[in-house]
Amino acid sequence: MKVFRQQLEQLGAQNQYRSIPDLIHQGRYITRENRKMLNMSSNDYLGLASDENLRRSFLQQYGGNFPSFTSSSSRLLTGNFPIYTDLEELVAQRFQRESALLFNSGYHANLGILPALTTTKSLILADKFVHASMIDGIRLSRCAFFRYRHNDYEHLKNLLEKNVGKFDRTFIVTESVFSMDGDVADLKQLVQLKKQFPNTYLYVDEAHAIGVYGQNGLGIAERDNLIAEIDLLVGTFGKALASVGAYAVCNQVLKECLINQMRPLIFSTALPPFNVAWTYFIFERLPQFSKERSHLEQLSAFLRREVAHRTQIMPSETCIVPYILGGNEATLAKAEYLQGQGYYCLPIRPPTVPKNTSRIRLSLTADMTTDEVRQFAACL
């Protein structure tokens, strides 16, 4: 065990040691070590996770005869239930696409999609800042890959030009809203680039955009009127939609390839039908949350201005607002100070973010009030 203890000691010396906190959730507040704090670190962007009215309406429709609490199997064996197909059809219909496929989590989706759809003769070109789950999926693909500079589409174009005709297919991989900086990919440019090169496919992760952007809450692709142009549009139900699981929107051919070749789908026990039914309930109502989306944007614009005034660094265009401090020690100290002031703010350090860009990732939710965010900004 000595070697493992040494690894932990090294993490501690670098201010990178992590532990799982004991938390009590009370709506938009969190209690930790007897301190009640406004939760500034949640991905519950629309504030639906603690909405008692939604929860009550969902439960009442069953009259005590609830869907099963377990699927007990993979969907390809005996773990498929009608509610899965119902949700896939609803998602596909809302996106006006041919097909949709459900997954247990966003991590499962990103881990399995690329290995299922590539060969050793394929190429993957990924934004430098894509999520760790995408990086893990790329590594498992065992094909050639390059990471283009973050949102640098000239660099991406150069990589595409250099590799024309060398591979059987090319996947461009990006997030729409980036989870640590809160900035947004230019999906229009990516679609244009994809169309310029043969056998090139665009894979966009909308985990932090679904629910929050677009007239119907379908994400940046909806906002930019590009849903039909993106080959694989992936999102999660576990953030703004207050549930669990993930989806991919695509054509029927790609869906069938994933069903036949995607290991995390084939070899995982499916989500409980009860959870899938809750997801259906929320997703069906997604267009109704326009007031929450508007309020969240107002809060976000205010906080972005306040943080930019203090740090002069503001890549964000969204409700994810990075307060970049640089060093681990300063970031840990600031997070502890803000927690002492009644705000649950968490430090984000390497390897989650690049070296010397440690930050507090501020994440706003629609159930916060304007006064609460103003009072928080005054503490910065």
Swiss-Prot record:
Record keywords, A-Z: Biotin biosynthesis, Pyridoxal phosphate, Transferase
Record's catalysed reaction(s): 6-carboxyhexanoyl-[ACP] + L-alanine + H(+) = (8S)-8-amino-7-oxononanoate + holo-[ACP] + CO2
Entry's EC annotation: 2.3.1.47
GO biological process, one term: biotin biosynthetic process
Cofactor(s) required, per the database record: pyridoxal 5'-phosphate
CDD domains in alphabetical order: KBL_like
PTM-bearing positions, type N6-(pyridoxal phosphate)lysine: 239
PROSITE patterns, alphabetized: AA_TRANSFER_CLASS_2
Function: Catalyzes the decarboxylative condensation of pimeloyl-[acyl-carrier protein] and L-alanine to produce 8-amino-7-oxononanoate (AON), [acyl-carrier protein], and carbon dioxide.
Alphabetical list of NCBIfam families matching this protein: bioF
Similarity section: Belongs to the class-II pyridoxal-phosphate-dependent aminotransferase family. BioF subfamily.
The protein's assembly and partners: Homodimer.
Name the UniProt record assigns to this protein: Putative 8-amino-7-oxononanoate synthase
Organism annotation: Neisseria gonorrhoeae (strain NCCP11945)
Lineage of source species: Bacteria, Pseudomonadati, Pseudomonadota, Betaproteobacteria, Neisseriales
